[in-house]
Amino acid sequence: MVSDKEDTMTDEQNGWTGGQRAFGDFAPGLVHYTDKVLFDEVWQRKDLSPRDRSLITVAALTAMGKTDQLRFHLDYARQNGVTDDELKEATLHLAFYTGWPNGMAAMTVLKDITDETDT
């Protein structure tokens, strides 16, 4: 049963369903590895919290300039307890290490997300 939150990517019975929701039967291999391996296994490992995994993922996506995936993971980081101020500071810090254009692109995505939730 899907939880009450309308935009959730988890299902109590089936686990993570974001890949299935995105691709359905179009890409079953990608759906399987995204939902069952990455989110149901890797993200659930105990040595790092979901919050820490979110920060690491945001850093990696920022470094690679992957703004499409970054949008989801910035929002997911917020769901995992990372504050907007922490995300802003992390993005500023990342700009020095990943290149200013990547930092600016990431900050633009974060601003869009916060603008949407503030209205």
PLM-predicted stretches and their roles:
Residues 93-95, 99-104:
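Substrate/cofactor-recognition hotspot
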Residues 53-61, 90-91:
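Short, structured motif recognition centered on aromatic/hydrophobic residues
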Residues 65, 87-92:
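Short, charged low-complexity intrinsically disordered segments located at boundaries
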Residues 60-66, 98-99:
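Short alpha-helix boundary/capping elements
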Residues 1-51, 64, 71-79, 102-119:
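Acidic, glycine/proline-rich low-complexity segments that act as flexible tails and inter-domain linkers
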Residues 82, 86:
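Winged helix-turn-helix DNA-binding recognition segment
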